[in-house]
């Protein structure tokens, strides 16, 4: 079967999801990528600019030009299209007219747009939370999310600390440090600045000062004390997990919380928000959940509320982990074992090909 995937396509979470779908489906089918708009384009990047990739003249939205889209479908004899995080629904009407089967990978939706997903022939959800929002639909499929456990793997197989005598914490801020709770992490870390054994790394694809100008002096002080290192650039997978022992992710809102399974697979203990979908992945034997102090709506009307984590509770967890390195070592080993048992994307998504083939 010839399958198309409509997606953003560069170094970011949504594109990694599409790439993993492509790799799984390519074992039995011909897969073609239609790159719609997004924050960036990776055209010219040998990792992303592949022979099966078509770069549309898209905008920074999920808008699609009808003539251009139809030309791509015809040129590749596309039979079925998987849409990743599609918010512009008109192309679904076109696909109905053209006899193309459509499958939604669910991530973004509001109370008003959920009924619109009925136009799809099939719906794929990667978290229990997403499934619960679409439980009235007939052709819905739950594929537990996972990751590439061979790519994301520990630096040391015995769970030892990256740097002897120091527990190193890590936060991946990506393109949106506010949504990833990076400010909460910084504030909690500042409450731990008297601890000699604590170190932290923040990886961000944008400048922190753009998002948190009010925290500039705090970040500068933590850097001057040798507690915090901020890495501001795009880094390809498997990222910087190998440099840390504990992943800290006080996210305020996520579709999957993609970096959490990546961190677990990399053999990191995990501290994250006690809110779905993050708390679907983290268990007591290799991590901790941060109490949520507030739930509040997002201004664009996204279906699920945002959350705010308790900064003092997070600070106490950082202190607890930093002062108990032996426990952290055991948690790291258990994290990797859990990933091998439960988080293999190749295993978890093995039924995706069947779902697509059986979509009517």
Regions picked out by a protein language model, each given a short descriptive name:
Residues 117, 234, 239-244:
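Short alpha-helical donor nucleotide-sugar binding micro-motif in glycosyltransferases
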Residues 121-154:
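Donor nucleotide-sugar binding/catalytic pocket of nucleotide-sugar-dependent glycosyltransferases
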Residues 212-235:
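Nucleotide-activated donor-binding/catalytic signature segment of Leloir-type glycosyltransferases, i.e.
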Residues 252:
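Aromatic "clamp/platform" in nucleotide-sugar-dependent glycosyltransferases that forms part
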Residues 308-309, 313, 323-356:
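A charged, aromatic-enriched C-terminal amphipathic alpha-helix characteristic of glycosyltransferases
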């Amino acid at each position: 079967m010839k399958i198309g995937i409509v997606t953003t396509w560069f170094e970011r979470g949504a594109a990694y999801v599409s790439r993993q779908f492509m790799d799984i489906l390519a074992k039995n089918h011909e897969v073609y990528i239609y790159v719609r708009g997004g924050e960036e384009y990776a055209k010219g990047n040998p990792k992303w600019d592949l022979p099966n990739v078509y770069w549309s003249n898209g905008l920074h939205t999920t808008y699609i030009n009808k003539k251009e889209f139809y030309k791509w479908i015809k040129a590749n004899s596309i039979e079925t299209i998987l849409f990743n995080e599609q918010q512009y629904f008109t192309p679904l009407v076109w696909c109905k007219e053209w006899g193309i089967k459509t499958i939604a990978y669910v991530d973004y939706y509001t109370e008003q747009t959920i009924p619109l997903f009925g136009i799809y022939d099939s719906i794929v959800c990667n978290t229990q939370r997403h499934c619960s929002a679409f439980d009235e639909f007939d052709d819905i499929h739950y594929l537990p999310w996972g990751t590439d456990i061979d790519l994301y793997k520990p630096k040391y197989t015995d769970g030892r600390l990256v740097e002897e005598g120091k527990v190193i914490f890590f936060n991946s801020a990506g393109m949106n440090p506010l949504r990833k709770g990076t400010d909460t992490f910084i504030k909690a870390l500042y409450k731990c600045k008297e601890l000699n054994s604590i170190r932290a790394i923040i990886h961000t694809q944008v400048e922190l000062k753009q998002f948190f100008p009010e925290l500039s002096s705090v970040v500068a002080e933590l850097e001057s004390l040798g507690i915090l290192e901020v890495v501001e650039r795009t880094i390809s997978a498997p990222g910087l997990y190998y440099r840390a022992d504990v992943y800290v992710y006080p996210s305020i809102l996520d579709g999957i919380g993609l970096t959490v399974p990546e961190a677990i697979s990399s053999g990191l203990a995990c501290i994250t928000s006690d809110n779905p979908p993050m708390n679907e992945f983290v268990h007591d034997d290799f991590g901790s959940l941060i109490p949520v102090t507030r739930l509040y709506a997002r201004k664009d009307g996204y279906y699920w509320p945002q959350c705010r984590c308790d900064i003092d509770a997070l600070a106490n967890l950082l202190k607890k982990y930093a002062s108990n390195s032996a426990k952290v070592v055991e948690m790291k080993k258990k994290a990797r074992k859990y990933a091998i048992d439960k988080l293999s994307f190749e295993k978890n998504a093995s039924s995706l090909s069947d779902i697509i083939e059986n979509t009517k």
